[in-house]
Every structure is written in C-alpha cells, then in structure tokens.
C-alpha cells in the first residue's frame, strides 16, 4: 500500500465522567462469588467425590472399587457408576451390576449405553427410556460475515486464484485486467462477487476514486448477496472522497439489498452519518431509526445511543430464584447436575442438563436455562439458546453466556471484555485448539505462554491452558500487554484488532489505513476481512455483556460521539478524539 497519513495524529485523552464499565466489572465479579443455587454436597462429600472421579479419570480401578465398597450409596453414585461401567478400560461389569444400576433409574444420559451393555450380557426386558421431545432450532446472534463465494462454475478456478494473488500483492489494477477478460462469461451472482472484490482491493489501497467507480458497477448486471457489499464499498469510497450525497445513496441501497442484519444496520447508520455531512439532517433521523430497530447489532446499539433510546431489558434475563429452585429441586438430573458443578465437573453437568432439557417437562425449560446460567455453564447456555421445546422461547441473554470462572490471579481487566473475546475465540470451549496451536477459551498461543508465564509465576512448560482460570489469566495479561503497546495507543478498537491479527499489522495500519481520525472508519477499513469482522463482533459482544450488567456503556457512548474508546479499566473507561495534521481536537465534556 502506497498511502501514508500526512502529518501526525493529534490526540487528547479524556477520562469518562461516569464509571459505567466499573458497574459491569462489579456485576460479573459478584456473580463469580455468589449463587442462588443451594449447595447439595457437604465439604466432606465434595472431597470424597473429587477423589472418586479422579480415580476413574486416572483408571485407578482398585481405588474405585474400594471406594464404592466403603461407601455404597450417595448423591452422585449413580452417575459415577455409569462412568465407571462404561469406561472401555474398566474391569468387566456383570449383569447383576447392570440390573442394579437400571433399577435405580434410567434418567441419566448414560442409560441407553448401559442398556446396550446389558443386552450384551444377556439382559432381558430392558426398561423403557424417557421419551425425548422435539427441540426447535433457534436463530443465532447476527454476525458481520461476508456472503459465500459463488461456486456456479462460471468463474474458472485458475482465474479466481490469479485475481486473489493480485489482490494479496496489492495490485488491484492487475486484478481488474484479469476480471475484465472473463466478466462477460460470469453469472450475475459471480459477476457481483468479483467486481466487489476488485473494488474492495482498490479501497484498501486507498485508491478511492477507482474503488468508487468499480463498486458502482457491482449492481449493473449483478445479482445476489454481493450486490449489497458493492453498495457498501461504494459508500465508504465516496465518504473518503467527501462525496457525501453519493455516499448516502450507496449506503441506503446497501441497507435495502443487504441479507445480513449487521450490514443492514451498518448501512442505515452510515447513511445517517452521510446525510448529516451532506446537510440533510431531516432525512438522517429516519436512517438512524432503521438501524435502531436491529438492537442486537453493533450499529443498532450505536443508533439507540445516538437517539437517546433505552435498550430492551430482555437482554438481561431474570436471575435464577427460589421459585425456579422449587420447580426443579425434585428433578433427579437437576440435583445431579448441581452436585457435579459443585465438584468442578462442569462438562458432566453440561451433559446432564442438556439431556434433561430433552426429556423434561417443557414448562421447566425456562427455569432450567436460568439454572444453567446460574451455575455458570457457558456451553449449556449456548446450547439451550439454540434448542428449545415447541412453544418455548429462549432468553436472548443465553446467546451471550456468563460463566463463573475467574483468572487464577484475579480479575485485572473488565470481565465483560474477556468474555466478549472468549465467545468469539472459542465459543467458551475450554478444549478448543486452533491449527496454529492456540488453545482454550481465549485461544492462547505458545508464544503468549512463553511471554507471560513468568509474570504469572508459572513455568511455560507446565501450563494447563484447558483450565479456565489459567487461560483467562493469560488472556487478560495479553490484553494488558496490547493496551500498553505503542501500536494501539490504548485504543480499544486497535487492541481488539491486535488480539486477532497481532501488533505488526496494527503498527502497519497506523500509517496505511486512511481513517481520517474516525474510529468507525478505521474499523470498517481494516485490510484483513477476518480482523475487520472480529473487531465488529467482539465490540458487539462486549456491549451485550454490558447490557446484562444493566449499566451504560462508556465505549458505546464514545463511538456514538465519534471518539475512540480507550481500554476499559476496572474503574471505568476514557475516550480520545483524533484529528489529522494536528487540527484542533474537540473533547467530550
């Protein structure tokens, strides 16, 4: 990229007058330290079962057998025996043991496997299993994603790959020449895609006039989801050319043709901005209200902020309470899941609660989902958010699950920010491993372990990144390191970008991205699509977690005012305004 911002970027830090982020931090820290679920196990029970399950996990069968002999019954024995019997390396289980297990109930998720094992041992007349109700799939929270590439055979792979290579090599002119040679043979859908890709290549090279001209061809004899992306590219290019009337028209067309809620809201919001710049404020409010209707999107929340409208309270679901417990306390699987959670067997508790959701009374579903949240089981919350009985409706808060985990060194950053990253990085899967060997909740890389282990008084060779507390500790250390890096300047959008792409690209983008000191323009002009999407998604996640805490959002206020939100400290968030060429800097009072 040949462009470099002339002059310097002047900035002034402004501390936030309201410590909204501190209320979110306090909310999530308090959740980790208190619960409305009664304890079912005594301390001695917890110690005993931890020892028993550790013996099963380590295949210490003599210890397992002795412990069952010494204590033949207890609240988690039925589950523990199922784990013991079904382990492929455990001693052979005879028919009498299987029949005794089945006589104690078949509500556990292992019951079918136990019956199958019994049939191999000569079991006759096996008991009926509970019937499973139909669960209806629910929609996912919207994400800013590109349309799928058109694969209809009209674009030869060789030319597609050659165009991509030109784009990667920062050669949009070369990509354009290749496209011109095949354009007439493409389907309308493929034509829209490849014209948009070339237009975007011009845009990220800061060749805005060429980007606008190319983007305007996308809807001409083009069709499909890529048309909206073409209008979007045209809008951004026109914006940077100060052609705000053209930008407004392009953004409005993008909002009308978009098939993605996040892009739709973004287009409405940017149309409003462009109309203000083109001195048509009477038309801007209508566009802003269009964005505000999509209140679970990044720009929908920004629009609500700018309009001064309160966000719906439904995103902070009701807490688990005594009424819920009275409804569930006699359900065997509920008691099993609660007890498993008490001894740290979250994966097992997750399995049991999911199974209960399938076999239980549909009227218990709401209470069951609130129990999953109260126990801090993120995987269960996500699953229940997207699988509900007929006639039920999942609370939206479940799509942004709140665990009860905390870093081994205590919270140093806003938990809402850590959860926002973890949701996008791993979907809260503690065992997630990427092709680059990034591991766990916050996808910690080997180099991150080596860099931060000494500060955490850990040996890099013996770090268990599958442990949530350990992984969160490394994640927040990484966030603080990025906060302090000169490349980010402590600015939240750049910190998020660096978490995904690394500091080297962010350093390069500081001079290559023509953002005009505008944080939203920066976010929309990040050259890497993955990082551009990542920043939008994580920022949205962060605001959704702040909504759960019931407080305002300093970072959302800052962006709505055209300011850069800074890293959210536990005491609150500041904001800065950047200007190009040392122009005067206005600040928020």
What are these regions (language model features)?
Residues 7-8, 18:
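Cleavable N-terminal signal peptides
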Residues 19-41, 127-156, 165-169, 564-589:
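Compositionally biased, proline/threonine/alanine/serine-rich low-complexity intrinsically disordered stretches
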Residues 21, 29-123, 127, 132, ...:
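Alpha-helical, heptad-rich or low-complexity scaffold/stalk segments
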Residues 34-41, 65-75, 85-89, 100-108, ...:
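Solenoid-like repeat scaffolds
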Residues 42-52, 81-82, 156-163, 193-196, ...:
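Alpha-helical tetratricopeptide repeat
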Residues 82-86, 95-108, 117, 188-192, ...:
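Catalytic glycan-binding domains that act on GlcNAc-containing polysaccharides
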